[in-house]
């Protein structure tokens, strides 16, 4: 396929794509160009770029992450890790910068990872977190908030399927319905990586 392929739901190119695919989901055997969508997948070869929430290929490592920290103490996520780039989709509970009632969050992070020594790597990512405050809502705390976050991570892979990591970062928690920050501060996290 040469040129531009646009669809509302999915694009499928069984052979080589030379150009651009734009849809919610994109698939091509070989890509010479750009895939833009929520989920992008190529099977054999990429000479170009994928721009989406999840970018995958046969070599993508799909890893489960379990972690906690000073902002949300209980989190679980799925990381789609390629050679250099990765994305993380996660959920967490008990957002700590509210009162003590139940709250939950959903997050998306995208970043770069660099190996520095046998099993040791550093990475950095930018993220967005949606926070549902549930019963915490009052005159000061709205029903929903969002956070913009930056993190630096240090990860050590103990075995091929098990690793540990520590994270430091900074986040701004903001209102959806008005300008200004609800809160801001440091992020400290640690956890494990499976698979």
Regions found by a protein language model. Name each.
Residues 24, 38, 53, 74-80, ...:
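Residues on the lipid-exposed face of transmembrane beta-strands in outer-membrane beta-barrel proteins
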Residues 1-4, 18-19, 33, 103-118, ...:
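Long, low-hydrophobicity, solvent-exposed regions enriched in small/turn-prone and acidic residues
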Residues 11-13, 27, 41, 58-60, ...:
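Sequence/structural signature of outer-membrane beta-barrel proteins
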Residues 16-18, 32-34, 46, 83-87, ...:
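Repeated loop/turn-to-beta-strand initiation elements of outer-membrane beta-barrel proteins
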Residues 125-149, 153:
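Outer membrane beta-barrel transmembrane domains
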Residues 44, 48-49, 53-82:
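Long amphipathic alpha-helical protein-interaction segments
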Residues 1-60:
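Repetitive, compositionally biased segments used for assembly/scaffolding
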Residues 18, 30-32, 47, 68-74, ...:
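Residues that define the transmembrane beta-barrel architecture of outer-membrane proteins
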């Amino acid at each position: 396929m040469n040129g531009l392929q646009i669809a509302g739901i999915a694009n499928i190119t069984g052979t080589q794509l030379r150009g651009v695919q734009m849809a919610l989901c994109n698939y091509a055997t070989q890509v010479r160009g750009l895939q833009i969508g929520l989920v992008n997948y190529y099977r054999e070869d990429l000479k170009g770029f994928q721009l989406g929430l999840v970018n995958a290929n046969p070599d993508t490592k799909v890893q489960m992450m379990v972690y906690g920290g000073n902002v949300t103490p209980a989190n679980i996520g799925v990381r789609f890790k390629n050679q250099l780039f990765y994305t993380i989709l996660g959920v967490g509970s008990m957002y700590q910068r509210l009162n003590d009632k139940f709250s939950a969050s959903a997050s998306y992070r995208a970043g770069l990872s660099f190996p520095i020594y046998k099993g040791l790597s550093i990475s950095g990512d930018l993220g967005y977190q949606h926070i549902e405050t549930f019963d915490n809502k009052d005159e000061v705390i709205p029903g929903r908030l969002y956070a913009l976050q930056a993190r630096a991570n240090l990860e050590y892979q103990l075995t091929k399927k098990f690793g540990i990591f520590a994270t430091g970062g900074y986040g701004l928690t903001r209102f959806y319905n008005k300008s200004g920050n609800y809160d801001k501060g440091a992020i400290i996290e640690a956890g494990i990586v499976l698979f």
